[in-house]
């Protein structure tokens, strides 16, 4: 008979890779057309002027300019816009 239990596999050791979500360019910072502003799950922040929405809800700039955040509407939803460079 074995004097020790078999060294079975542990039940730990699994974790998903982080998805690197969040704001990539903050208010007042310059951004080029096509640059990613926010990576998010769902529309936590909504697209404003000159901002496009990707199929994974990523917000990106449609023109060169500066990023501007605002809270709009009675529901106080956060919106992000790009103010074109003058």
Swiss-Prot record:
Keywords: Ribonucleoprotein, Ribosomal protein. One of its GO terms (biological process) is translation. SUPFAM superfamilies: Ribosomal L27 protein-like (SSF110324). GO terms for cellular component: cytosolic large ribosomal subunit. Residues 1-10 have a biased composition (Gly residues). InterPro entries: Ribosomal_bL27, Ribosomal_bL27_CS. Belongs to the bacterial ribosomal protein bL27 family. This is Large ribosomal subunit protein bL27. It comes from Cupriavidus pinatubonensis (strain JMP 134 / LMG 1197) (Cupriavidus necator (strain JMP 134)).
């Amino acid at each position: 008979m074995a004097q020790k239990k078999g060294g079975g596999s542990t039940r730990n050791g699994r974790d998903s890779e982080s998805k690197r979500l969040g704001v990539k360019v903050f208010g007042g910072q310059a951004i080029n057309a096509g640059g990613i502003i926010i990576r998010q799950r769902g529309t936590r922040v909504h697209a404003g002027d000159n901002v496009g929405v990707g199929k994974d809800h990523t917000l990106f700039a449609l023109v060169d300019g500066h990023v501007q955040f605002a809270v709009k509407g009675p529901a106080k939803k956060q919106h992000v816009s790009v103010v074109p460079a003058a």
